[in-house]
Amino acid sequence: PSADGRLSLEQIKECYFNHWNDHSHEHTVQPGMVYLSCPAENGLIYSKAELTGISEFCHQHGLYLFVDGARLGYGLQSDGCDFTIADLARLCDAFYIGGTKVGALFGEAVVFKGEEMHRSFRYAIKQHGGMLAKGRLLGIQFEQLMKGGEDCLYFKLARHANSLAARIRTAFEKKGIRMWIPSQTNMQFPILTKEQQEILGKKYVPELWGRYDNGRDVVRFCTSWATTQQSMDTLCSLLKEYK
């Protein structure tokens, strides 16, 4: 398991070489692909240098590199991101652009670097019951979401969510409440007492992320393309009740 929700190059190397240095390696699954989530489940993103290092190791050792981009828009538009979608296309063998979490009605757009995987993918879709009769509707959504380059609707919606998440972080920090992790995306993780959670429960349903210490929990807040300034105002007014 990782220390901060992200896989490190050293962890990947350790797993890979432990397998091949084992004289009975044929009795375990052969390493074939590295799977990264970006952003990770806790809102953290990889740096361009980290992705480059992982990509180079993968391609030197015959491993595919796949990036789960369910929240990719929020990662690419965060203040801490130093790579572009073009960098992902260069460094990865495959990744997907998440639509469902960034305003699309349904669906994700899978991007392949090589012709070999692209040619076989439609067979996999069909064999696993994922081929839609009206699949073109997926494409129409992404055509509209991605139109306009850096000023496209996809990135605008992501920036909107990130800005409101930053407002959540600022509001909690002004009340002296610590954040569990320095997320710069649309997810924030304040550390709250039971009493503080009950106050929020008047208007919201806080998601319990995990126990922090005696009497305090890590709670996750997610903003999205649909979050409104009015919702933020309501949250900030509830925080005024915190002692």
Regions found by a protein language model. Name each.
Residues 33, 64-66, 94, 218-220:
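Structural preference for beta-strand elements that scaffold enzyme active sites
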Residues 25-26, 30-40, 45, 82-184:
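Active-site C-terminal subdomain of aminotransferase-like
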Residues 40, 71-73, 101, 225-227:
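Active-site-proximal loop/turn and secondary-structure-junction residues that shape catalytic pockets
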Residues 76-85, 198:
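Distinct, well-ordered alpha-helical segments
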Residues 166-167, 171-241:
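Conserved C-terminal alpha-helix-loop-beta "cap" of PLP-dependent enzymes
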Residues 46-78:
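Catalytic PLP-binding core of fold-type I/II PLP enzymes
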Residues 1-41, 46-53:
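PLP-dependent aminotransferase-class I/II
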